[in-house]
Structures are given as C-alpha cells and as structure tokens.
Amino acid sequence: MIQAQTYLNVADNSGARELMCIRIVGASNPRYAHIGDVIVAVIKEAVPNMPLERSEVIRAVIVRTCKELKRDNGIIIRYDDNAAVVIDPEGNPKGTRVFGSIAGELRHLNFTKIVSLAPEVF
C-alpha cells in the first residue's frame, strides 16, 4: 500500500532513481495506492545528465509493492520493494527499458507497453 510521503524505487531507465508519492490519482481508494494505480510523485534522486531532474513533479504507475496482492485464484504475490515506472500524460513509459519483474495485472489495466518492456511478468 502506497500513500503520500512513501518513497519508491524507479524500475526503468528514465533517469530517476527514487520517487516520493505526493498524490494518488484515479484509484478506488484515495488514501492508498496498489499495483496498477497512477500516482503523482516528486523525484528525490536522479541520475546526472538525464532528461529528468531532481525535484521534478511527474506521474508514475506502481508496478511492485511490499504489501501482498491476492489474486482470484488464491495466489498471493509479495515483492521485496515498492517500485514504479515513470509515465507521460498519455500513459506511455518515458524510459525504454523496465527492470525487474512486474505484476500481470498491468496488462488488464491498459499498460501494455510497460508489460512488453518488462523482462518478467508474474
């Protein structure tokens, strides 16, 4: 569960390394965000000489959470970190690569470009 002031790792090569959530956009619960929810975040740590800079406000979609995700078939998924992928206003990823595994629920939420870039979808 991601809420305001939560720090997240960035799972792509957009130039940001660490984000802090400042607002949850379009989720069923406006207080907590889960996998597949879009958040507004500020970049807390960035790679030098990249398009995204520190203290820039961006949108991101959550791809991994430490909080368990229970599927309809009974499988429970839990990741080691909270991670997000930086997206543009249309929902396309800003980076060209995605690192680590992501949840398959993103495919049903129309983030198919992120799913196609991921090395492992679970």
Curated annotation (Swiss-Prot):
Keywords: Chloroplast, Plastid, Ribonucleoprotein, Ribosomal protein, RNA-binding, rRNA-binding
InterPro entries the UniProt entry points to: Ribosomal_uL14, Ribosomal_uL14_bac-type, Ribosomal_uL14_CS, Ribosomal_uL14_sf
Subunit structure: Part of the 50S ribosomal subunit.
Domain of life: Eukaryota
Role according to the record: Binds to 23S rRNA.
Any GO BP annotation: translation
Protein name: Large ribosomal subunit protein uL14c
Any one annotated GO CC term: cytosolic large ribosomal subunit
Gene this protein is translated from: rpl14
Localization (cell): Plastid, Chloroplast
A GO term, aspect molecular function: structural constituent of ribosome
